[in-house]
Curated annotation (Swiss-Prot):
It is found in: Nucleus; Chromosome. Induction: Restricted to actively growing cells. Peak of accumulation in the G1/S boundary and in the S phase. This is Histone H2A variant 1. It comes from Arabidopsis thaliana. The gene is H2AV. Transmembrane segments: none annotated. Pfam families: Histone, Histone_H2A_C. GO terms for biological process: detection of temperature stimulus; negative regulation of DNA-templated transcription; regulation of gene expression; response to osmotic stress. Residues 18-27 have a biased composition (Basic and acidic residues).
């Protein structure tokens, strides 16, 4: 009987040990979840490392801060664009709504000076072109 049953006993012990290890092991938490933001902190950190001129040296909190800024700006633009689309009674945000939202806000306009494809132009009529009715 030597050799019979011994292997099963060892296998049972290792399985029990693995279950104990699984209990002790914590589920990995992403840096985005730790910071409480939706934008990917790890991906932004990798992009910062490849683009920085300091030989890939980027602080750990720099990526969290950058992701937070990007998330805030995105939420701000989407909120204003959603308001613009709601004013026009449309359910889908288009580049036109983004253009109206960005150009309507003074701070976002100075931050985003580039052209938005398909955004059109901002409606504006110069004061001198408006027909003035005078009572005489």
């Amino acid at each position: 009987m030597a050799g019979k049953g011994g292997k099963g006993l060892v296998a049972a012990k290792t399985m029990a040990a693995n279950k104990d290890k699984d209990k002790d092991k914590k589920k990995p938490i992403s840096r985005s979840a730790r910071a409480g933001i939706q934008f990917p902190v790890g991906r932004i950190h990798r992009q910062l490392k490849t683009r920085v001129s300091a030989h890939g040296r980027v602080g750990a909190t720099a990526a969290v801060y950058t992701a937070s800024i990007l998330e805030y700006l995105t939420a701000e633009v989407l909120e204003l664009a959603g308001n613009a689309s709601k004013d026009l009674k449309v359910k889908r945000i288009t580049p036109r709504h983004l253009q109206l939202a960005i150009r309507g806000d003074e701070e976002l306009d100075t931050l985003i000076k580039g052209t938005i494809a398909g955004g059109g132009v901002i409606p504006h009529i110069h004061k001198s072109l408006i027909n003035k009715t005078t009572k005489e």
